[in-house]
Amino acid sequence: DCKILIIEKEQKIGMHGSGRNSGVLHSGIYYPPHTLKAKFCAEGSRLMTNYCKEYKLPILKCGKVILPTKRQDYDQVDLLYERGTINGASVEIISQKELLEIEPEANPAIERALYSPNTSVVDSFAVLNKIQFELINLGVKILFNEEVILANPDQSTVKTNRGSSFKYAHLINCTGQYSDRVSKFFNVGKQYTLLPFKGLYYGLHKNSNIQINGLIYPTPDLSMPFLGVHSVRLVDGSVYFGPTAIPAFGRENYQGLKGVNIKDATSISYHLLRQYAGNKQGFRSYAHQELHKLFKSEFLKSMQKLVPRLSDSNL
């Protein structure tokens, strides 16, 4: 018996989306004003920044520049500036000279860019461990190695793979890549199927002569849910470039064929082919563009639009 119970299918926290991320605290630049995404992103960034400062968790305020890599992208800079300002983010449009003072390795051909000086990076695992510590102290019970495999909404119960059964008053579905499956236990979202994508990164060699001070992003295609390959500076000072956005043929297919099973791979392939054939929101051209980045040479070309001096030997 407990007031709050967390059922965790893994043996420890942060094994999936909560731990497998760059730790960037976005400030609400990308989302249309007055939307929930804009509101939660801006407020969430502020709250997480204060949380890290209060508990002395690692946080790096390194700033972010967003660069237009094509002539038509300059309009996007103005749009993002407008959105960011309305959403309460600290943003400014900077000149070529100002850009190169902030990021000397940035493409010198870029005439103006968007600058978000307050964008920060946190250590995701440090945050998770602190939250876990606080929750346990508050009496929250966490069950590890327990996976919900069945639910009975009429009786307000869930059953796990270990034969345990739990009755609830309120249930929150925060199962990440399995959220669509769990929702269907409750007859919710039956028309939806989650398509997993994964991002691949390259690290910058520590002895490289390329100096990246913060985050360097391209102006994004706002019709897509991805921000394009960019630079990320972590709290320990290491720098990574990525991520790509390629289909994963399993909900935990992080590397090679690990996490792939025939049933999931078949279902995912079917839905991807439907998306490709239907070409909704330009999915087909985007797929071609992203698949090219599986080759290191093509990935490098994308990054060189932002950081021209970057070479194969740096990655």
Question: Where in this protein do the model-derived segments appear?
Answer:
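Dinucleotide-binding Rossmann-like beta1-alpha1 core, especially the glycine-rich loop
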Residues: 24-98, 102, 111, 229, ...
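A short small-residue
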Residues: 22-30, 278-283
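Flavin-dependent oxidoreductases
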Residues: 151-262
